[in-house]
Amino acid sequence: PGMMDTILNLGLNDKTVKALANKTSNGRFAKDSYRRFIQMYGNVVLGVENYHFEELIENYKLTKGVLLDTDLDEDDWDGLIKDFKNIVKEKTKKEFPQDVYKQLLGAISAVFLSWDSNRAKIYRKLNQIPSEWGTAVNVQSMVFGNMGNNCATGVVFTRNPSDGSN
């Protein structure tokens, strides 16, 4: 009912991305994770339209002559991180937050505020969900789905999410 916007990789910043690269011995993965975080946080928390980020990725791929995001290397993600942070600054007039606690508070606030979004109101009306109920925030550690070709993530429901049947 709050529409379940997701922000992955919260806590990454210019400093922690280096630690993640060192810990995993995979700079490309770390930089890709950081740019994903900037994109999700920029969209969900800061209100930057997603197409601004997607357009940049597509332009990078065109310039390199590749089709897939997985064909971009660590240097490409470095460039995109800088460009993504510039988009955030241009659209919000603020620097992308480097303080992990401010990132967390921003994400939590965005989830609570999503309850009053037009999309959530329409969904609640269509599904007869009372507006007095409110929404919850889940903060959890997760595995990475973008660490390599043998990594993935998924969602499992124990009940039908549409009607609640077993």
PLM features: residue spans?
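Nucleotide/phosphate-binding sheet-loop regions of phosphoryl- and nucleotidyl-transfer enzymes
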Residues: 1-166
